[in-house]
Amino acid sequence: MQDKEFKIAIIGPENAGKSSIMNALFGKYVSLVSEVGGTTKMPIKRYWGKLKIGRIKEEPEFVNLVFVDLGGLYTTTDKQSPIMTPKVLEKTFEEINDSDMIIHVIDGSVGLLRSFERLHHLLKFRYQKPIIVVINKCDLLNDSDKEHLKNYVERRIKNTPIFVSAKTFEGIPELLDIIIKYLKR
């Protein structure tokens, strides 16, 4: 019997830290990172590893965990990214459609963009995909800013975010735990 593939697409605006989060999840450099927005154009797919998810000892069930780093659909000023040509946009939405789960990355220093709020609702209700909302760059936020952003995100998209820092690895183990718990449910 062939192991199933469980694909997780990482989405967010340009420079939100999607590639950095992917690198942090892998514990090594697997996706190009740059200060310049639009570095990731075509989706970058990486095999994370095999996870045992079955509970039956005699017939263990495994899943191949795959992460897909997608280019930023929008800029931090809420405009469509210039890298999103029709071909790139089509490939990006193919990957989103084929994914089993979404990690929606919000840049903590910018906040939730209206365009991503709309995309979040589309993914949640039309595609009915599980979505983990991640607020990156939490190392740049004080406790008051974190609380305000958390409340705003919960109110706007009805999803409790987790705070991570791809730079300091804060929250990365918790993100992996959430993914693994979802798979083992």
UniProtKB/Swiss-Prot annotation:
Pfam families: MMR_HSR1 (PF01926). Residues 17-137 form the G domain. It comes from the Archaea. GO terms for molecular function: GTP binding. CDD domains: Era_like (cd00880). This is Uncharacterized protein MJ0920. It comes from Methanocaldococcus jannaschii (strain ATCC 43067 / DSM 2661 / JAL-1 / JCM 10045 / NBRC 100440) (Methanococcus jannaschii). The lineage of its organism: Archaea, Methanobacteriati, Methanobacteriota, Methanomada group, Methanococci.
